[in-house]
Regions:
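Helical element adjacent to the flavin cofactor pocket in flavoenzyme catalytic cores
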Residues: 1-42
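Hydrophobic/aromatic beta-strand patches that form the interior of the parallel beta-sheet core
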Residues: 16, 45, 177-179
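Active-site substrate-recognition segment that forms the wall
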Residues: 21-23, 30, 38-77, 82-174
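Conserved mid-domain beta->alpha element of the FAD-binding
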Residues: 170, 174-187
Length: 187
């Protein structure tokens, strides 16, 4: 959701990534301080998904769900041909904790099919390896002709989930907004 929004920003909007805000001074002109610089802007949307919610703004309304997934190496042309004619695709489960399977633009298959409560933390290496066995079994069941394809990447992330399973967009002050609990499902 946020990536889609970022791609369509008008020329007069600046996007700052990988720049954690460590202090905010609200006002007619908001001042945001990062470890490297200070940013001043009249209007600010903080798209922070989960982390700030856990410790402040909405902690009574949100829980952190830890997800994990695996991504294959780049597929060969012969392997891609076993998948049909679509050049990139994604499948989302109707169930909120269900699997996500994608053929990426760079011709890898990404599978994410574990969602669990892990006390708002990422999975450790041992937990990740155990989850990768689940990913492998699911991958082999869905793509038996590709069961020889190894996973090259393994990841986990914490996603904010609200009780009513929707996102949060909140006005914190007249010109400061917060966006959280967005995961892109159903979009």
């Amino acid at each position: 959701l946020v990536f889609g929004l970022a791609e369509k920003l008008p020329k007069n909007v600046e996007l700052y990534e990988n720049s954690p805000v460590i202090d905010i001074r609200k006002g007619k002109i908001n001042t945001l301080r990062t470890p490297e610089s200070t940013i001043r802007a009249e209007n600010v949307i903080m798209a922070c998904n989960y982390e700030p919610l856990a410790s402040g703004q909405q902690k009574q309304r949100v829980v952190g769900v830890t997800l994990s997934g695996s991504i294959t190496r780049v597929l060969t042309q012969d392997e891609i041909e076993t998948l049909g004619t679509e050049t990139s695709w994604g499948v989302l489960s109707l169930h909120s904790g269900g699997a996500t399977v994608r053929l990426t633009d760079d011709k890898r298959i990404s599978i994410r099919n574990t969602a669990e409560y892990n006390n708002h933390r990422l999975l450790n290496k041992g937990q990740l390896k155990a989850r990768q066995k689940i990913h492998r079994q699911s991958f082999d069941n869905r793509f038996p002709d590709l069961s020889h394809v190894p996973f090259e990447h393994l990841y986990s992330g914490v996603e904010g989930v609200t009780a009513n399973k929707t996102n949060i967009f909140k006005r914190l002050s007249p010109n400061l907004y917060f966006a959280g609990c967005y995961n892109g499902s159903g979009i």
